Amino acid sequence: MTLMLDVENARKSFTMHLQGGISLPVVRDVSFKVNAGECVVLSGPSGAGKSSILKMIFGNYRCDGGRISVRHQGEMTNLAGAEPRLVLNARRMTIGYVSQFLRAVPRVPALDVVAEPLLTAGLSREDARVRAGALLGRLNIPERLWSLPPSTFSGGEQQRVNIARGFISDVPILLLDEPTASLDAANRAVVVDLIAAKKQAGVAMIAIVHDDEIRRQIADRTVDVTTFAAAA
């Protein structure tokens, strides 16, 4: 199996500047590996640090120490503490992120919001929009809505647009932060199928999923985040 992600002794704390610079430890000694075609689910109660770990991998949070190595352009590259240019390049080419919430640009149609990652990757506008439409249709977004900005959609529709945008990319590593939260049974099943297809394509995935049944369906392994709890 090809190693795609290797997290070694990563740690994170936050400095509370409005409270006299108090340091609030979040996680420490975070260590796990993810191979190509594998979905690893982070488990643990709310507040245990699951989302913080995903954000450390994606580069939204800077690590205080340790290594986060991803297979980027054929080589294992440490993104912990990396220069912003390298992190942005890895996001563009290697790591995708599917969150619960969509930050849509006003007045941009849903079809273009979903197609944008493919356009960035160099696909033609026509082909990107065809693929975007197919994925929106699969996630039960009516075609009459595709030309409208997602800011006018319901919360559930916005979430499905966000899922489509995340899954449309051909990146080899995908981070999933509660992708099935608030979805009905039919759309949860679609997301499970999308994850299965990504596995088949060799994509490495790290997921946060609170639904026990969904976790059983998608997880090849689970990592208990409580073992990384940082003592205050």
Placement of each model-derived feature along the sequence:
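Catalytic Walker B motif of ABC-type/P-loop ATPase nucleotide-binding domains
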Residues: 174-177
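Conserved ABC ATPase "signature" region
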Residues: 127-144
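Q-loop/switch helix immediately C-terminal to the Walker
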Residues: 101, 108-119
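Helix-to-loop junction immediately C-terminal to a conserved catalytic motif
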Residues: 58
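ABC ATPase C-loop
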Residues: 166-167
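Hydrophobic anchor residue at the start of the ABC signature
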Residues: 163
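Conserved ABC ATPase signature
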Residues: 149-153, 157
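ABC ATPase NBD coupling module
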Residues: 76-96
